[in-house]
């Protein structure tokens, strides 16, 4: 799960596994610092990504679930349709100082999988498409984003080849996020 704080709006990308709910409310409270959660984006309907969606939307009754939400009324019949906002490829959320652009996933873990792109950080949230990229001598998985080596994106390309091409729009990607780092 990731939390993005814009100057005007906030969005949580993926909600984490329901087994981690015990720590999520406290962490969100600390990170939001009195602000509210405006949006929740779930990349796809798999438990590690959507496990806390119902509880989050219950805790933040003004928050809207955005993304490919065509089936979500079946999973969460308690939600009003006004809280489910279907986003299409290329549509954006304006958070103030940054935008989140929704993209059709090139690799779909499940039908309805979407990716998100943060225009400020130039960061692609690629659901499960890219896996973990690190060498055994580096403990990248236990590192916070701000602690990571500045050249991580360049070095990652030395160790992984992405077997696809043909993005519909050219986007500068400085970092890729697959799962929490």
Annotate each predicted stretch with a short phrase.
Residues 1-30, 115-118, 122-126:
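Conserved beta-strand hairpin/beta-sheet module of binuclear metal-dependent hydrolase folds
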Residues 13-15, 37-45, 65-68, 124-128, ...:
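Active-site neighborhood of phospho(di)ester-bond hydrolases with catalytic His/Asp-centered motifs
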Residues 20, 45-50, 72-75, 91, ...:
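Active-site environment of divalent metal-dependent phosphoester hydrolases
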Residues 20-65:
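Active-site metal-binding motif and surrounding structural segment of the metallo-beta-lactamase
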Residues 26-28, 55-58, 79-82, 138-141:
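Short, glycine/charged-enriched secondary-structure capping and boundary segments
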Residues 63-113:
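Metallo-beta-lactamase
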Residues 77, 105, 111-115, 126-129, ...:
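A short secondary-structure junction signal
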Residues 132-181:
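Cap/insert and terminal regions of metallo-dependent hydrolase folds
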């Amino acid at each position: 799960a990731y939390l993005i704080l814009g100057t005007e709006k906030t969005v949580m990308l993926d909600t984490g596994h329901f087994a981690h709910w015990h720590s999520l409310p406290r962490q969100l409270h600390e990170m939001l610092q009195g602000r509210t959660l405006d949006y929740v984006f779930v990349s796809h309907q798999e438990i590690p990504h959507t496990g806390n969606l119902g509880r989050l939307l219950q805790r933040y009754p003004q928050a809207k679930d955005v993304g490919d939400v065509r089936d979500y009324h079946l999973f969460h019949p308690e939600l009003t349709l006004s809280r489910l906002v279907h986003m299409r490829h290329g549509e954006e959320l304006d958070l103030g100082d940054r935008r989140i652009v929704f993209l059709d996933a090139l690799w779909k873990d499940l039908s309805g999988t979407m990716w998100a792109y943060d225009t400020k950080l130039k960061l692609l949230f690629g659901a499960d498409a890219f896996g973990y990229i690190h060498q055994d001598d580096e403990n990248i998985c236990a590192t916070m984003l701000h602690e990571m080596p500045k050249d991580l994106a360049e070095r990652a390309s030395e160790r992984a080849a992405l077997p696809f091409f043909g993005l519909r729009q050219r986007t500068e990607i400085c970092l890729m996020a697959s799962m929490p780092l």
